[in-house]
Amino acid sequence: MQADVIFRNADIVDGTGQTRIHGDVAIRDDRIVAVGELSKWHGGRDVDCTGLTLAPGFIDPHVHHDEALLTDPGMDCMLSQGVTTIIAGNCGFSIAPLTATIDILPQPLGMILTSTRPRFARFADYRNQLRQSPAAVNSACLIGHGTLRINEVADLGRPADAAELKAMEKSLDQALGEGGIGVSTGLFYPPARAATTAEAIAMARIARAHGKLYVTHMRDEGDQGIEALEETLEIGREACCGVHVSHHKCAGLANHGQSEITLPMFSKAMLDQDVSLDTTPWTASSTMLNSGRHRQATRVIVAESLAYPKMAGRDLADIAREWNTDLDTAMERLLPATGIFFIMDESDVRRILSFEHTIICSDGIARGDHSHPRVWGTFPRVLGHYVRDIGLFTLEEGVKRMTSMPADRFGLKDRGRIREGGYADLVLFDPATIESGATYEKPKTPAHGIKNVWVNGRESWADGANKGNRAGVVLDRDPS
């Protein structure tokens, strides 16, 4: 039998959570055509995998690379850590459909969409552009409720009125029909903070009509986190819609240990409704600079400041001392800005990671030189630190949480598993050396231990370098 490429003598972790096997994998065109003992097969190229692990390409279900897919299509930050598929449009903010004519976009949309290129008034226009100018990774996109509010609601400081809500519903219905894989909300952020629970339910009902998900950055992840989770579950129940909670965390010193309450809430809800969650493997979060958040953190690093670009990478406390002022005043001067907030407790991070239903995500945004290390290092951090060094769960379980689990949850057909007939999205890595190279001091450092990455049958990353292939495709949600 003939194949384009045969991976030989690999430890195959297939993404299902089952015990690894030793064997070979053959690919032809963009598909896996055989798995097992393939000594009688011949390949145009043989890849010796002795001592290495072959896994499905990792799937990142929560990124903010909506614009970067077009402006930085090589996607080094993703390929270098083994990611072959991403889901954008999270936290209520997608860059399409965007019909608002204002020059300065409300944050955080203004941090996600920064170029002067023409805006995409229809979601179909954005997808068509991605098809015409492919990126190096596969992509799917949620439709942001916050973006719809910016388009339709005259005063973002109040709930939508009946006419505005109807306009948002119509726009969402169209965008989902054009390939959006669900709706996302970011009720935590100013453009959507005034939205009522009923408004969110209305969005979820449109998603349900399309057989798609309601994905949410909840209204609060700190002092009101339990109430916000209750609201999220209510939205799912009332809309009869599947709910996915993004980057679940317990933020703020007063809320450390709260995962002992929230995780049982998830378990109980899962008995009666369709609920899932993802999380990141870090004790620091990253979002817009705001006073409420910095007061809950033990340390804040400025990731980016449009007003003072040279302050990126520095501690907020050091900047305040240099300016001879308090933290609040320093923060106000830096705005608009983003920060890295050391705000979670390691025990909560481990507890949430080890929860059997948790999917892994990065919550990364590819901007600037001082971003959070999660942009480049999330998935190797899980497999290196939490799997190999800490033993939080097995390698097979870790890979499952970043492959088949997100693929199944978001309806990415034939992705996330090494099996005959599946797409040839693959990552070859050394389990003894894999780890994040990114740190808070040097966040744009590629991961260690990633040998090769293949996207749809094409080698896209090898030995620390981008191969220049743009093999990514635009994905839809499979309703089955």
Regions found by a protein language model. Give the residues of each.
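Divalent metal-coordination and catalytic microenvironments
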Residues: 10, 25, 30, 51, ...
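Short acidic, glycine/serine/threonine-rich loops at helix termini
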Residues: 96-102, 150-156, 197, 226-230, ...
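Divalent-metal coordination cores built from histidine and acidic residues
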Residues: 71-181, 273, 282
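Histidine-rich, glycine-flanked metal-binding segment
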Residues: 1-6, 11-57, 72, 436-439
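C-terminal cap of metal-dependent C-N hydrolases
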Residues: 351-357, 362-363, 378, 427-475
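His/Asp/Glu-enriched, well-ordered alpha-helical/loop segment
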Residues: 237, 293-329, 333, 344, ...
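Di-metal (Zn2+ and/or Mg2+/Mn2+) metal-binding site signature of metallo-dependent hydrolases
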Residues: 53-77
